[in-house]
Curated annotation (Swiss-Prot):
A matching Pfam family: ATP-synt_D
Name of encoding gene: VHA-D
Record's function text: Subunit of the peripheral V1 complex of vacuolar ATPase. V-ATPase is responsible for acidifying a variety of intracellular compartments in eukaryotic cells, thus providing most of the energy required for transport processes in the vacuolar system.
UniProt record similarity statement: Belongs to the V-ATPase D subunit family.
Name listed for the protein in its UniProt record: V-type proton ATPase subunit D
Compartments reported by the entry: Vacuole membrane
Main location class: membrane
Keywords annotated in UniProt: Hydrogen ion transport, Ion transport, Membrane, Phosphoprotein, Transport, Vacuole
Keyword Plastid included in the entry's annotation: no
GO molecular function: proton-transporting ATPase activity, rotational mechanism
Phosphoserine found at: S241
NCBIfam families assigned: V_ATPase_subD
């Protein structure tokens, strides 16, 4: 399990936050698809296992039957029948070809048997044991068919087993490493952006307070300047000092406040 502090080394920006969210969405979708693929491969894996068990049981019976048939041929036609059969065979009539089958994106090798050409040993053992020779041939053909099927199943089984292990490793990596790391990175970026937002808000409040105080100071200076100008006008008009003009102005303001409307 990835640690709580495991994250990607990124610059905490809004753009990077969008990139990390997109990567998390992609990782989540990939995890879901790989999980479905693993489940599908597991189902196929179990089905192959059942077929292999059945094929092995059938192979045992077939090999037993073919061995008994060969023993019967040797008893009836003699040990020489093997050389007679080999002399009449120039090329194999039962052959095997390979192909691939795609299951959930995994290519599984398959083997198929087929007959090609004519059998040249139909008259083998005509003097004695001909019926037993044909029965032995049929028994061994069936045994070969079962062996080919078993080889195909076991090869597909091993390939599928490796594919399931690889898929499960990817699922675990996405679930326990990639997704937690992306989630931690997103949480880190959000925390840093929130901190930057708080700092910007505090800085803005300080600037607003400074501007407000500056406006108040300028207003006070303007008011003081206006009062000075009024006092100078009164002083010049009445020929009195600035202090006398200030007292005159204050006294006039007090008389105005006593007037009752």
């Amino acid at each position: 399990m990835a640690g709580q502090n495991a994250r990607l080394n990124v610059v905490p920006t809004v753009t990077m936050l969008g990139v990390m969210k997109a990567r998390l969405v992609g990782a989540t979708r990939g995890h879901a698809l790989l999980k479905k693929k693993s489940d599908a491969l597991t189902v196929q894996f179990r089905a192959l296992l059942k077929k292999i068990v059945t094929a092995k049981e059938s192979m045992g019976d077939m090999m037993k039957t073919s061995s008994f048939a060969l023993t019967e041929v040797k008893y009836v036609a003699g040990d020489n029948v093997k050389h007679v059969v080999l002399e009449n065979v120039k090329e194999a009539t039962l052959k095997v070809r390979s192909r691939t089958e795609n299951i959930a994106g995994v290519k599984l090798p398959k083997f198929d048997h087929f007959s090609e050409g004519e059998t040249k040993n139909d008259l083998t053992g005509l003097a004695r044991g001909g019926q037993q020779v044909r029965a032995c041939r049929v028994a061994y053909v069936k045994a070969i068919e079962v062996l080919v099927e078993l080889a195909s199943l076991q090869t597909s089984f091993l390939t599928l087993d490796e594919a399931i292990k690889t898929t499960n490793r990817r699922v675990n990596a996405l679930e326990n490493v990639v997704k937690p790391k992306l989630e931690n990175t997103i949480s880190y970026i959000k925390g840093e952006l929130d901190e930057l937002e708080r700092e910007d808000f505090f800085r803005l409040k300080k600037i607003q307070g400074y501007k407000r105080r500056e406006v108040e100071r300028q207003a006070a200076n303007a008011k003081e300047f206006a009062e000075e100008m009024v006092l100078e006008d009164i002083s010049m008009q009445r020929g009195i000092s600035i202090n006398a003009a200030r007292n005159f102005l204050v006294g006039g303001a007090e008389k105005d406040s006593d007037i009752i409307f």
